[in-house]
Amino acid sequence: MFTKVLIANRGEIAMRIIRTCSRLGIKTVAVYSEADKDAPHTKAATEAYLIGESRVSESYLNIERIIKTAKKAKADAIHPGYGLLSENSRFAERCKQENIVFIGPSPDIIAKMGSKIEARKAMEAAGVPVVPGVSESLGDIEAACRTASQIGYPVMLKASAGGGGIGMQRVENEEALKKAYEGNKKRAADFFGDGSMYIEKVIEHARHIEVQLLADQHGHTVHLFERDCSVQRRHQKVIEEAPSPFVDDELRMKIGQTAVKAAKAIGYTNAGTIEFIVDQKQNFYFLEMNTRLQVEHPVTEEITGLDLVEQQLRIAAGHTLTFSQKDIQRNGHAIEVRIYAEDPKTFFPSPGTITAFSLPDQKGVRHECAVAKDSTVTPFYDPMIAKMIVKGQTRTEAIEKLETALRDYRVEGIKTNLPLLIQAAATKAFKEGDVTTDFLKQHL
């Protein structure tokens, strides 16, 4: 096992990784920007190093500074967390060049799955169903219009290198496509350095179901069942749960086996997630693969009893999985909500100083958090400030705990999405599990 791990991240995920490393006796190295000089992760780690200015490009996205810091601290591995550099193949390659273990898959797999077009091609080759569409980069606007008319409107215009909803837009007709195409192409080029676009058919009234995978370096791959992430705003998840209320045992087995087959086909290692879109008839289609730990990994941990960060560390250190598929059992129901520092109606970020902060303290409620009273939420980074996870023996029990905990959650000084979460959890549709990716638009 590793002696010292540098965490190339911030916020709650840095705290989460530090917690597992500490339990395993692994020393931790935190990195921080000027804006984060007093952040909790800098105090929780064994060592902490300033890596740059507040701007993310000058700190958490600065590959060479992070590598230099890892060497200075004599870290033998780097955990990228999620977001930031976690799916940057160049970062993984630089770690490899410096003989620092990157806790994740190989650089070539990150690159392949990072290109949504290449990922579609790989899944098609593996016999995994993909959303009807094209697996080639679109050329000019005329080519895009021809392709869309062949598929049939409405279509989803997507950036090949995209993520977090950036460069993605639903278009209803040719006129809308012409308006959207160049803007999204430019946005993708600006954000990701790749303006390649492709088109997929819109699956109406769909659910977003993803499968958590673990794969060691010795050919063993298992799935840890599914998560339902259908409650979204602007193509970003807000509420996630495991298991899905929509997935029956037959679909669970089928979608899990398909995800394992897909991971094996590309030679995947470490923790990963395959996201599927599922229609009303339970047909499922590959959307994308996330080659990192997911924000919503705690709901899987709660129902399986496994520490996914520990498994990542063990796999990266060359250990074999100590369990097989049949050993993994589901227990209970878990729901996660993301607490964002944002206006609950407009979704605009709400930076500022937290003047009061208290977390609900009840059995079956878990908090992943990196803010406190007097913490400053800056405009430089993602507005998610915390996650709350509830677990019950049944979904009904979990929802009851969720509603109670949300009412007891207190954040003052900034706006948050807590009112939205309270409303969502109280709806008849959510309680009945009648949730699609249109849920927030339809019910709130």
Curated annotation (Swiss-Prot):
It comes from Bacillus subtilis (strain 168). This is Biotin carboxylase 2. Its EC number is 6.3.4.14. Residues 120-317 form the ATP-grasp domain. Pfam families: Biotin_carb_C, Biotin_carb_N, CPSase_L_D2. Its cofactor is Mg(2+); Mn(2+). ATP binds at residues 116, 158, 164-165, 200-203, 208, 235, 275, 288. Residues 1-444 form the Biotin carboxylation domain.
